């Protein structure tokens, strides 16, 4: 598995409230995480970093990682619920952090399958051959309006409340988590990203960049550059996982 990560403050914001991590384990298992924080002062930065750090710690502390998709989803849910409580309790104990929260999207790769869990509007995309699909469903007010047929997807792109979330990590004591698992084959690519990328780079451009012959790190660099070229009003984060077709001699799979 080839991996790459890039997070950037963007051209307008003073602080980067996004965070991300790629954690490797035994048997080439990989956990990738993207979090997009929110809250007053620097609280969003606190929430996203807490989420990524805690997921990484739980990954490193795990004696065994399940391989069955249903068990992988269960493991992700348990860890994210624990992180939710940790962020919520921290916010309640620190006045300057009250109301903080974060999105989270995680992908757990276990060889031939990937399990994805998410809260909020940070996304996971899958590229298989020429099929480029959004794996996650945004937990946002605008997406709910689209889902119920009140507005079109085209209207959603320019809706004034586009960034209003219907749920986030750490804002409530209890939260529901969406999960999904699927098979992955050599050549497939998985993109995890914050809305600072998807609000500025069209799906066709995302697909074209992922399909290019560039190295994974060059691809995520280009994705972030594109978002900045198109305004860069928000923090931008992209994590790329590529299941290599073959291992080139001397090439680093990590």
Swiss-Prot record:
Mn(2+) 1 binds at residues 36-37. It comes from the Bacteria. This is Protein phosphatase PrpC. Binds 2 manganese ions per subunit. InterPro entries: PP2C, PPM-type-like_dom_sf, PPM-type_phosphatase-like_dom. It comes from Bacillus subtilis (strain 168). Mn(2+) 2 binds at residues 36, 195, 234. Disulfide bonds: none annotated.
